[in-house]
């Protein structure tokens, strides 16, 4: 604040802001620091201070491009929540100023992009500004409503660089959140957005398709109800897949799937993405037809998992995951259960395939969580006297049944040599536990084992889950401590890259901590638990027992 031109400010901000989820004292300090630095209204005449603030925020957002933006969302939420009931709302006012000025800066950078000398720099700045606007939209979409029409033309950006693609994806994400909040948007504006999105879906790759279909879902489902437009697109790609399937069935030895690989992959992905955001079994889409679209789509996708080369086989899984988000009941189908469980339990199966199946489960759980939170908010608005808990239990029944089906195989993925597989398995288990979909006792030994992982982020996540379980169910941890120790040894065996080296129970770093130090610290506070644990360990070495 005192030295606004100091060159290390961005670096300092990045380091501070990452502490936003630390213990209460540090969290409070971080919130106060950034409230002073960024979220205090700036006098209108002080353009220089405003520009400095914008550059500082966008520099920090750009610097965190690879590590994710959770911290920014958390910070914004903390600050806006703290003044919800206050009559004077300085943070809200500052956010409005920042959003308005970010839009001004975007228009300025766009003008200067025609100046070839600074193209790279300004293109990077443009992406950072639009990304920052998306982060604001995620927490307070109302701030962007008046700027929606300014953002729409960016959907027609000509894509030649990575930055161009990022602009399109972020603009699509902003419009997805903002357009449904607009009061009486013009027909022309909505039709233009639909046309622009459809052109992008037909022309570009997976990431663009995913974000544009998601945006189209919000615009069509919540605003225009232009179902015929989407139905035509679905039929185009569904028809292409059906045709390829029929040709392949007539002559299974033909090279038709290989020869039409690009069309096959685009059709698979687009059909999956559309099924995620639209329920084509609604009368609005298929009219009076008795055909069950979701079953037909599943049949098609499963056909290509059985008759594809390795790359095509792998690329059948993202669309399957998309279809299961809209229709979770499909995960109870016997062939889906067999397929998923065989991939998760097969030791020789490719790492990428295991990760994709775990990602599918993770995305389903995340979407389900978002859906339930939204349902909770809607109910609170409509009828405060209703029993929300009961409603949550009904809608989470399906998720609970699904996770029971795949739980064992997901937990066994903790014993994989690749850290990326363990990472996604832990994410799925954390989401499952946070939503209360399974009884936590069955996960305790596995979480103890994951607490010995060499990667700090995974260790901390597993340890945090154990702390939460211990708060709710005292005694569960010590009850499963010995089983957890045995599994810890299995995890260490799996990740031991040099089989000749013996497995050690401590970290080979400057701390030389015991791998199970977190478990010991949780048990040592209770004398009874401590003694029972030590006796159980000693009994393992008792020949007479």
Predicted regions and their residues:
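Alpha-solenoid helical-repeat scaffolds
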Residues: 63-64, 68-332, 342-345
């Amino acid at each position: 604040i005192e030295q606004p031109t100091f060159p290390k400010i961005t670096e300092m901000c990045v380091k501070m802001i990452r502490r936003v989820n630390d213990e209460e004292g540090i969290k409070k300090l971080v919130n106060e620091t950034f409230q002073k630095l960024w979220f205090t209204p700036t006098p209108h005449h002080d353009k220089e201070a405003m520009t400095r603030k914008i550059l500082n925020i966008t520099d920090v957002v750009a610097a965190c491009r690879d590590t994710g933006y959770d911290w920014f969302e958390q910070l914004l939420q903390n600050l806006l929540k703290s003044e919800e009931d206050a009559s004077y709302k300085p943070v809200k006012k500052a956010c409005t100023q920042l959003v308005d000025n970010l839009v001004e800066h975007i228009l300025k950078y766009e003008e200067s992009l025609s100046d070839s000398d600074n193209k790279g720099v300004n293109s990077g700045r443009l992406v950072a500004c639009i990304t920052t606007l998306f982060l604001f939209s995620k927490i307070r979409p109302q701030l962007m409503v008046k700027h929606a029409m300014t953002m729409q033309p960016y959907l027609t950006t000509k894509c030649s660089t990575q930055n161009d693609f990022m602009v399109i994806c972020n603009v699509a994400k902003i419009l997805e959140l903002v357009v449904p909040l607009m009061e009486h948007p013009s027909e022309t504006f909505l039709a233009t957005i639909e046309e622009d999105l459809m052109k992008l879906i037909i022309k570009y790759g997976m990431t663009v398709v995913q974000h544009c279909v998601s945006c189209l879902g919000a615009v069509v489902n919540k605003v225009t109800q232009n179902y015929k437009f989407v139905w035509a697109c679905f039929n185009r790609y569904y028809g292409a897949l059906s045709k390829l399937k029929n040709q392949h069935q007539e002559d299974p030895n033909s090279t038709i799937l290989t020869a039409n690989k690009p069309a096959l992959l685009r059709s698979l992905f687009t059909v999956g993405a559309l099924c995620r955001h639209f329920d084509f079994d609604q009368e609005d889409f298929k009219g009076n037809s008795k055909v069950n679209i979701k079953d037909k789509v599943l049949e098609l996708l499963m056909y290509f998992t059985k008759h594809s080369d390795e790359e095509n086989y792998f690329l059948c899984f993202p669309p399957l995951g998309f279809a299961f988000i809209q229709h979770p009941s499909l995960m109870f189908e016997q062939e889906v259960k067999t397929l998923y469980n065989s991939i998760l339990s097969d030791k020789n199966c490719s790492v990428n395939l295991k990760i994709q199946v775990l990602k599918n489960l993770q995305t389903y759980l995340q979407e389900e969580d978002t859906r339930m939170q939204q349902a909770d908010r809607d109910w609170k608005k409509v009828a405060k006297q209703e029993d929300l808990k009961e409603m949550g239990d009904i809608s989470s029944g399906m998720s609970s049944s699904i996770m029971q089906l795949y739980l064992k195989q997901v937990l066994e993925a903790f014993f994989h040599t690749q850290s990326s597989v363990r990472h996604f398995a832990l994410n799925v288990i954390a989401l499952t536990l946070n939503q209360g979909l399974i009884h936590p006792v069955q996960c305790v030994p596995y979480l103890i084992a994951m607490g010995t992982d060499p990667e700090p982020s995974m260790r901390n996540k597993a340890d945090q889950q154990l702390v939460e379980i211990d708060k709710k169910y005292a005694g569960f941890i010590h009850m499963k401590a010995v089983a957890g120790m045995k599994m810890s040894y299995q995890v260490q065996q799996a990740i031991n890259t040099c089989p000749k080296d013996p497995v050690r129970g401590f970290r080979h770093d400057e701390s030389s901590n015991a791998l199970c130090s977190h478990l010991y610290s949780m048990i040592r506070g209770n004398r009874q638990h401590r003694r029972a644990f030590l006796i159980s360990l000693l009994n393992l070495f008792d020949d007479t027992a």
